Structures are given as structure tokens and as C-alpha cells.
């Protein structure tokens, strides 16, 4: 109604509607984001391999490089801790709550936390089965009959022996290789889901914001992942292969999201959330029982390691805050 009680004429103005409606997400924008994410993440994954895997000229240079790698790995540990607590967990909890609300499901049972626990126990059971099988293959030496977390009577200095360095019995290298695989898998799966968020996006402005945030986030994570794998004494070829795999996951998610944009529904979202919850549970295990204990177990440069750990946490925290 008009100001004098007269009915107003409803006139459709195309220019006004176009200014209020979100700009549709074009296929070329998604393809550009896909290629850019692939190239940048791949470069960030391979740079640590090229820089830190050069053969040392003498034992002193090799020892110095190992100390530097340990310090940088503490920084990466802070990045992983922030990724676990401030990125993976909130994304998973928000997505599964949204999916359950869309399906009009009300739960009395803590399903979200149960899925996290299942992901946690999945890695634990796999590691224990692998370790038990390796121990039954032959009597391990006395120094290898230690707990899975690397704490023995001999002190914490034996921790790094279990990070992929070949041993006589081979019992300690198997859990380390498994943990490395689980770490890559959990990050790769989460990257697919982050790519899905871009691929399913129909608002171009929002999609560009997501792509920019992912570029920064994935670049930092790619460097941290390569440092983590190098610290596990894996071969450079294996680390490079894991970096390539990780680099392809977010573009894969963008492609899948683009293809499924028209058919995405609450059931699809619920299934995706369950998988993401399992991945978050595995990442919880790797973060708190592998990455942080290993870096803080040795007695060298404790204060500097804590500072670098906090710096890595603060860096990703600031990045996530900027996204808000």
C-alpha cells in the first residue's frame, strides 16, 4: 500500500533483481580455481622435498639439517593442531548438524562424538594389529620391545628410531608408515570435502572467497605435511608422491562438487559428514599421539620448540580468523 492508502503498482525491474541476486558461479571460474589450487599446492608440497632432502657433504651438515628439520616440524605441528581443533572439527560438527536438521532428525545419543571416536579407534586398532603381526614374525630385539608411543626405559631419545628408520626386527617402522598413510588419508579426505564446498557453491563472490582462503590454507598445509613426512624419515620419492596425492584432492573435490551441484541433498550431506567425522577422528589420533609427543619428547631446545609450536598454531588461527 502507498502512503495514502492507495495500492502500489508492482513493477518488476530486471536491473534491480540482477543487482540483488547472487552472480551465478560460472564453470570457467571453477576450472580456474581447480588449476590454481593444484599448481600452488603441488609447488608447496615439493619445495621442502627439494630443499631438505639434499645429501649432506659431511656428518655435521647432516646433523644440522636434522635439527633444523625438527624445529620446522614443531612449527608444522602447531599448524596441524590448529587444523584439527579449529578447522576439521568445526567443519564436521556444523555439517552433520545441518544434515540432521535438514532430515528433521532429533537425537538423544551423541552421534557426532561417537563417529569421532570410531575414527580414533580405527587407527588405534589398525596400528596394534600391524604391530602384533610384525612382532609375531620374529623375536624383536630388546630395544624394539617398547610401547607404540615410543616411551621406553632407555629414555625419549629412542623415539625417532620408530619413525620409519629400518630396524633389525622391523616392528617399529610399520606403525610409523601406517601413521604417515593415515595422516595423508585424513588430510586428503578433508581436502576433497573442502573442494566439494567450492564445487557446490553457486554464488560467485562467495566461491571466490572460498578459493582464496583455500589457496592460503592448502599452501601452508602442504608445506607442513611434507615436513611431517620428511621428519618420519620416509624416502623423498614417497614424500613427493604423497604431496602430489594431497595436491590433487581439493581439485578433485571441486570437480565432484560441480558435477553433483544439481543432485546434492540431505542424505548426500549426511554421508559426507560421516566420512568427514571419521577423518577428523583419525586426525585427532595422529595429532595428539604422534605429532605432538614426538616433537616434544626430546630434551633439546624445548623452549624454542614450544615457541615454534605456538607460532604455527597462531598462523593458522589468524588465517581462519581472516576467513570469518
UniProtKB/Swiss-Prot annotation:
The entry's keywords? Cell membrane, Endoplasmic reticulum, Ion transport, Membrane, Transmembrane, Transmembrane helix, Transport, Zinc, Zinc transport
> Molecular function terms in GO for this entry?
zinc ion transmembrane transporter activity
What the entry lists under InterPro entries is as follows: ZIP
Instruction: Tell me what topology the record assigns in the membrane.
Output: Multi-pass membrane protein
Catalytic reaction equation(s)? Zn(2+)(in) = Zn(2+)(out)
Could you tell me the superkingdom of the organism this chain comes from? Eukaryota
| Residue ranges that the UniProt entry lists as topological domain Cytoplasmic | 52-68, 126-179, 228-237, 294-303
Location in the cell reads:
Cell membrane; Endoplasmic reticulum membrane
The residue ranges crossing the membrane are 31-51, 69-89, 105-125, 180-200, 207-227, 238-258, 273-293, 304-324
Instruction: Return the GO cellular component terms, semicolon-separated.
Output: endoplasmic reticulum membrane; plasma membrane
> Could you tell me which residue ranges are on the Extracellular side of the membrane?
1-30, 90-104, 201-206, 259-272
Q: Which GO terms describe its biological process?
A: zinc ion transmembrane transport
Q: Reply yes or no: does the keyword Secreted apply.
A: no
Describe its function: Transporter for the divalent cation Zn(2+). Mediates the influx of Zn(2+) into cells from extracellular space.
Q: Which family does the record claim for this protein?
A: Belongs to the ZIP transporter (TC 2.A.5) family.
Task: State what protein this is by name.
Answer: Zinc transporter ZIP1
Q: Native species of this protein? A: Bos taurus
